[in-house]
Design a protein with these regions (language model features):
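Short hydrophobic/aromatic helix or loop-helix immediately within or flanking a transmembrane segment
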Residues: 55-63, 69-91
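Membrane-interface transmembrane helices that cradle and orient dolichyl/undecaprenyl
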Residues: 149-163
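Transmembrane-helix signature of polytopic, membrane-embedded enzymes
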Residues: 26, 112-129
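Transmembrane-helix motifs of polytopic, lipid-linked glycan transferases
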Residues: 99-115
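Membrane-interfacial entry segments at the cytosolic side of transmembrane helices
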Residues: 24-30, 193-205, 318-328
Length: 356
């Protein structure tokens, strides 16, 4: 854990330096490159048992020729292409892990850069470290998709719709579940057409419908799809399992987040503040639905990545007491989920390269 805390501290320090030089593009980007490199280095230097999904697919993608066959790929295209790219110059698995994290953090920081006039890069990096970094060491394909989706949302806020479509396509080839990003496009459109109040009431209604119907229908549909070969067998492990404690913690955290951001939305009824609440309400509904299996828990993480971006925007120039309250909640979530529960099995950190 000390390694993570050290890296987080250094990253936040460089983010602070970048914040002070935000008007100087070259210096600003240089500091962000340092942050991306540092976090990617720690990810690449880790042992193969840090993160449960390494053994599930990452190691096999890199070392098994069958996974590298583009004509018969059994896994999402982007990570296969990345593995083939690494094989051009290295057979070291750590280089592959380094580039995966560089992709994740690179796109995340690019999204923050697109919105840098509306957010604090210090808050963005702080939230990323506390809410997403350890998860990115585990659910790598989804994290690659989620970071690209952050860029899609940034372009959506900038009303650059062709780029929105382009980044949605890239996210899809990282992980097919990224189609959930369409929900944010729909929510954004509804706000533009019907206003925040009506859309907010509709979101609450749909969240309630989701909670009531999901557990009844979803896992039955998953089982039917698996039995009829409509889903690959690799998804079977996501449809079962006991995620009760993890989901209960997520429900508590979502409720804690919703309270201050509802106050912000009431005082500042802006689109980005509404999208923050939208993501939190959907996270809360999915946290309840994920009491019975992992697949919903993983889908919920898309909203976590989105909130890293929107938290940073909503809290920009907000009262310090509100900002510190949200940061304390993020720290509490990190301690419970990562330090104590070790969700994703990224703690403790070990590296044969660094001899720790």
């Amino acid at each position: 854990m000390i390694v993570y805390l050290f890296v987080f501290s250094i990253s936040i320090f460089f983010a602070f330096l970048a914040e002070r030089r935000r008007k100087n593009d070259m210096i600003y980007f240089l500091y962000l490159i340092v942050i991306v490199f540092l976090n990617s280095f720690i990810a690449g230097a880790r042992n193969d048992n840090i993160g449960t999904d390494i053994s599930f697919y990452a190691y096999r993608v890199f070392h098994t020729d069958a996974y590298l066959d583009l004509e018969d790929a059994e896994i999402d295209l982007t990570i296969v292409l990345l593995a083939k790219f690494v094989h051009f110059f290295s057979d070291t698995f750590g280089v592959f892990l380094f580039l995966i994290e560089a992709w994740i953090m690179g796109f995340a920081c690019y999204a923050a850069t697109l919105m840098r006039k509306k957010l604090s890069i210090v808050l963005f990096i702080s939230f990323f470290c506390l809410m997403a970094y350890n998860q990115s060491l585990n659910i790598m394909r989804q994290s690659m998709a989620m970071s690209v989706m952050m860029c899609m949302l940034a372009y959506l806020m900038r009303k650059e719709y062709i780029k929105v479509v382009a980044f949605m396509v890239v996210a899809y080839f990282c992980h097919s579940t990224s189609v959930i990003g369409l929900l944010f496009i729909i929510a954004y459109y509804c706000v533009q057409q019907f206003g925040i109040k009506k859309t907010f009431l509709f979101v609450l209604f749909m969240g309630g419908i989701l909670v009531v119907s999901f557990n009844i229908l979803f896992y039955n549909l998953i089982s039917i799809a698996l039995s009829n070969n409509l889903l690959a067998s690799q998804y079977e492990r996501y449809a079962v399992g006991d995620y009760g404690e993890t989901s209960k913690t997520a429900i508590l955290i979502c409720i804690m987040y919703i309270i201050p951001f509802l106050i912000i939305l009431k005082n500042k009824p802006k689109v980005e503040n509404f999208l923050t609440i939208f993501a939190l309400v959907m996270s809360l509904a999915l946290a309840y639905c994920s009491l019975g299996g992992e697949i919903v828990s993983r889908i919920r993480l898309y909203f976590t990545y989105v909130n890293i971006l929107f938290f940073s925007i909503s809290l920009y120039r907000e009262r310090k007491c509100v900002t510190w309250l949200v940061l304390v909640i993020a720290v509490f979530n990190f301690v419970i989920s990562i330090w104590i529960s070790n969700y994703g099995e990224t703690v403790p950190y070990h590296s044969k390269y660094l001899e720790i």
